[in-house]
């Protein structure tokens, strides 16, 4: 049986404790066999179509583009059962777990979308489910926490480190190392040790394959660019995979610039990371001067990750894909803009990609076709955004009050001087 290549250029690999090597090799073998098994593929396709709701729509926005020369299409993964692209590959991995005879599923989650997708797949397929989630993310994603519990999952808050996604990943991996004989670690992004980046890409690649078919039907040609947000990078690699061999299509990933790409408050390892070993892989990693992992930051929990999938690192290194960034403020503005212009509330993660697409559309000087992966819906973010907007309103009122007070003081001083 052929084996998969564990590397993408210099990135990737299997940097895990020796105890986990048999589990990873078993997973690789099961995946290769499943790819060639007609019955497995039929069951996976049936679940995607009749349970998850594929294919998802490709929507031409009517009011979003600021430039008549540029059309912006949205690939509507927000319409998928579970609310995001995560459901695609979770169903694939859950079927693989059953194929390997596993009874339990371990997962990590940031925004909660992967946790929800894992919980629904486990409920459907009769698997026990436990999800590790950073304590900070538990607080800012309470609707998704309740959804997971409602579907029977055990949600375990992680308080170590920064209490965010990277810490949840570490705890999930630690748990798995003690019970891999009966449990499958259902990793949520196209990162981590081989064979996960390849498995996740293959179980997400229908995003780009559908997009290609749909845009050819609608426009008679391929898009000028496909755009997706990048944290670990699963939604982006799912969109990019079918376009990598189409050189006329630009592949654009959008990292979270947080408070500013040149501040310490961001989550952009492709911009400011150095190659390191993290989460079982060799990849760009946010590190301090002593090589320690730096804390990442983003307003969106799902992009709050200090590294990135190895295939994205390789695509950047060879110049096939470019990786831009969008700040918290740009994402928040676009979150509201899409809701007002199109009646669609995007996930904050997706809003980063849409923000960059709007910027690109504005600059177009010829007819331009842009497709953005709307990777998830924004229900989970409405309370977070409402709180931030309220804080901004209070701060603005304080500034205006201070300005008014200063003007009154100046006026009083002038009147006193005139006396």
Curated annotation (Swiss-Prot):
Its cofactor is pyridoxal 5'-phosphate. The keyword Amino-acid biosynthesis applies. Pfam families: PALP. The modification N6-(pyridoxal phosphate)lysine is found at residue 86. Pathway: Amino-acid biosynthesis; L-tryptophan biosynthesis; L-tryptophan from chorismate: step 5/5. Keywords: Amino-acid biosynthesis, Aromatic amino acid biosynthesis, Lyase, Pyridoxal phosphate, Tryptophan biosynthesis. It is an enzyme of class 4 (lyase). It catalyses: (1S,2R)-1-C-(indol-3-yl)glycerol 3-phosphate + L-serine = D-glyceraldehyde 3-phosphate + L-tryptophan + H2O. Residues 394-403 have a biased composition (Basic and acidic residues). One of its GO terms (cellular component) is cytoplasm. Tetramer of two alpha and two beta chains. HAMAP family: Trp_synth_beta. Belongs to the TrpB family. This is Tryptophan synthase beta chain. It comes from Shewanella halifaxensis (strain HAW-EB4). The gene is trpB.
């Amino acid at each position: 049986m052929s084996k998969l290549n564990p590397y993408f250029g210099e990135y990737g690999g299997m940097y895990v404790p020796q105890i986990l090597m048999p589990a990873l090799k078993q997973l690789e073998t099961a995946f290769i066999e499943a790819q060639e098994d007609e019955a497995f593929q039929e069951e996976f396709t049936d679940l995607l179509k009749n349970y998850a709701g594929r294919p998802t729509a490709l929507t031409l926005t009517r009011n979003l583009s600021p430039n008549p020369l540029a059309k912006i299409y949205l690939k509507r993964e927000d319409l998928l059962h579970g609310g995001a692209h995560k459901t695609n590959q979770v169903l694939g991995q859950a079927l693989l777990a059953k194929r390997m005879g596993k009874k339990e599923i371990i997962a990590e989650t940031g925004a909660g979308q992967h946790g929800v997708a894992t919980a629904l797949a486990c409920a459907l397929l009769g698997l026990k489910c436990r999800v590790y989630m950073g304590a900070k993310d538990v607080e800012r994603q309470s609707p998704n926490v309740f959804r997971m519990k409602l579907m029977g999952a055990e949600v375990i808050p992680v308080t170590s480190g920064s209490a965010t996604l990277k810490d949840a990943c570490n705890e999930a991996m630690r748990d798995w190392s003690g019970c891999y004989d009966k449990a499958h670690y259902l990793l949520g992004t196209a990162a981590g040790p081989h064979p996960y980046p390849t498995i996740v890409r293959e179980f997400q690649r229908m995003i780009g394959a559908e997009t290609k078919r749909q845009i050819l039907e609608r426009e008679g040609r391929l898009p000028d660019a496909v755009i997706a947000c990048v944290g670990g990078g699963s939604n982006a690699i799912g969109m990019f995979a079918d376009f990598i061999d189409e050189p006329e299509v630009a592949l654009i990933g959008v990292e979270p610039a947080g408070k500013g790409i040149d501040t310490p408050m961001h989550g952009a390892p492709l911009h400011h990371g150095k190659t390191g070993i993290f989460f079982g892989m060799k990849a760009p990693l946010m590190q301090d001067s002593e090589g320690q992992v730096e804390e990442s930051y983003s307003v969106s929990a799902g992009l709050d990750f200090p590294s990135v999938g190895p295939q994205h690192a390789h695509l950047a290194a060879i110049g096939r894909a470019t990786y831009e960034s969008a700040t918290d403020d740009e994402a928040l503005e676009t979150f509201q803009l899409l809701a007002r212009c199109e009646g669609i509330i995007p996930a904050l993660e997706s809003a980063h990609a849409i923000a960059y697409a709007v910027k690109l559309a504005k600059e177009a000087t010829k007819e331009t076709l842009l497709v953005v992966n709307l990777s998830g819906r924004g229900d989970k973010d409405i309370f977070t955004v409402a709180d931030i907007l309220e804080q901004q309103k209070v701060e603005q009122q304080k500034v205006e009050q201070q300005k008014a007070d200063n003007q009154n003081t100046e006026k009083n001083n002038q009147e006193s001087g005139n006396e």
